[in-house]
Regions:
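Core catalytic alpha/beta fold that binds nucleotide/phospho-ligands
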Residues: 1-199
């Protein structure tokens, strides 16, 4: 079975090592991070750049939608929420989304879901599973968030068909955060989590 690697950095670890992160990213990554006014956003940006640099020394390229990639692979995708910054890595197109599992007012968000998904939310299905499943597929295909309503959230786990291609999605809870990983394949995959505790 194929393996998807999931690297995680706790935001507290990243804060503790901010000085080291500043030394481990290039000048453009540093400039990008320091443009953020909020320090937590600076640290998230630095940690994300650190993860990308750890993966490859190749220059980053960007597709038409702005999704970063390496010319010679591997495929990767980054997300952050709450306590964590995560990066999923695969030999095929990949998307990841993480959301802190907390109470949320659904009234303003229900419009982004199709009828079946909205019904599930109204019947108390977990919003974050639906959101993460949608978001990870959007990120896998490198599409715009403007298309979110047409992106299928279901199933949370298993094969889904979109635009004539098969994707396999896995959703799970890790330390009070919901994570969805979507990969361009109809084959299941295992996830190997690597927690980065020192930088």
């Amino acid at each position: 079975m194929e393996i998807v690697k999931l690297y995680t950095i706790d935001i507290n670890t990243a804060f503790h090592h901010k000085k080291a992160l500043l030394e481990k990213v290039n000048e453009s990554q540093k400039e990008k991070a320091l443009k953020y006014k909020n320090e937590i956003d600076q640290v998230r940006s630095l940690a994300s750049s650190y993860l990308v640099n750890k993966l490859s020394k190749e220059p980053l390229l960007f597709n038409d939608m702005g999704k970063p990639f390496f010319e010679n692979g591997p495929s990767f995708n980054i997300s952050h929420s709450g306590q964590y910054i995560v990066m999923a890595v695969s030999n095929k197109d990949i998307g990841v989304d993480i959301e802190e599992n907390k109470e949320k007012d659904m009234s303003s968000l229900i419009r982004i879901f199709n009828e079946a998904e909205a019904k599930m939310i109204k019947e108390h299905a977990d919003f974050y599973y639906l959101w993460c499943a949608k978001e990870s597929l959007i990120k896998c295909i490198g599409s715009s968030i403007n298309r979110i309503k047409e992106i299928p959230a279901l199933p949370f786990n298993g094969v889904k068909l979109f635009n004539g291609k098969h994707y396999y999605v896995k959703s799970f809870i890790e330390d009070k955060h919901i994570i969805s990983i979507t990969r361009l394949s109809d084959e299941p995959f295992d996830i190997k989590i690597e927690k980065i505790n020192s930088l």
